[in-house]
Amino acid sequence: KGKRNFSWRSDQAATLVYTVALDEGDPKNIVPFRDEVFQLQAPFDGAPESLLKTVNRVSRLEWANDNIAIARDRWFNSRNEKIYLFDPSGSGKEAKVIFDRNYQDVYSDPGNFVKNRNEFGSNVIQIQKGNAFLMGRGFTKDGQFPFIEKLDLLTEKKTRIYTSSYKEKKETISDYDPKKNEIITRLESPTLYPNYYRQNLKSGKLNQLTFFENPFKSIQNVHKEVIKYKRDDGIDLSGTLYLPVGYDKASKEKMPMIIWAYPTEFKDKSTAGQNTQNPNEFTYPYYGSMVYWVSKGYVVLDDASFPIVGVGTEEPNDSFRKQLVGNAKAAIDAVDQMGYVDRKKVAVAGHSYGAFMVANLLSHSDLFAAGIAR
């Protein structure tokens, strides 16, 4: 109940924005719109002005100029997200839904709007001749291919400007300049430390901006691959597999293994099985990384998929333990079939909800010899 989500319009000097729940803050109340967004201009002694109503809970507001703004809403139970184009000038134009999707469906993610800094030092959506621009991570069933897309705000027509074609490297687009048709991008591979480049999309010419060296050369030649496998109910799973330093793949010596994972809840099996791992990502150890164990003779399965799915009215946690054990068994089976792991010497590790996962796996299965619940 009441006003919430107070913020400032980034395209104006002093305009306050806030949200009011139209269902009294109770999701059980059935209403056509859950939230309404208002604005109040300085000196804040006038009547607030309604900007739009949203079907779900407002999650984000993005501003371009006096006549163009974007709102995003979400509803957790259905995982639905709507992206609205609206006119914040008080023209009375009805907000238009330009994207309506499952926010866990990474394959349909339209990306984020390209922004620049305005006279107030705030980031606003770039508009060029009635077009906005989107930068997407570009996950597909065939791999990750980041993209730039032009969106005509009048017709909603989308035009692909650029799609990454790298197959041996990972590309991450950091920024796009529509006027110059240039991107700032980062390139990396398992052994190539990430560096930044400026690229003209018309000519394709790359200009390297940074020249960082790999500080982790002791593990740069460690074998790394993204493996894909299935759970016993057919859901697609994946994980990033590392073999120990100096391991001879031809010998198929069975080694101890540690699995790092974090359970994720889904409402349908198709999104649960989507792959968001890129085999070309640089191997970057940090203080909590499991990758260090490759220097101690361990096989490491990092970021192993652990989906917990609840379809329809079923909640994911209704079958939490069964699905947890199914995920773990599928991961061990997959690496065992490759000939690398001693099944009697497998450990599992996780942080927070992942630590809860570890406790349940050690309590309700006999798959693991040890666990780290961080």
Regions found by a protein language model. Give the residues of each.
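Short acidic/polar mixed-charge low-complexity motifs
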Residues: 44-47, 57, 79, 91-94, ...
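Long, heptad-repeat coiled-coil alpha-helices that serve as cytosolic signaling/dimerization stalks
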Residues: 143-148, 347-349
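Short secondary-structure junction motifs
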Residues: 46, 78-80, 143-145, 193, ...
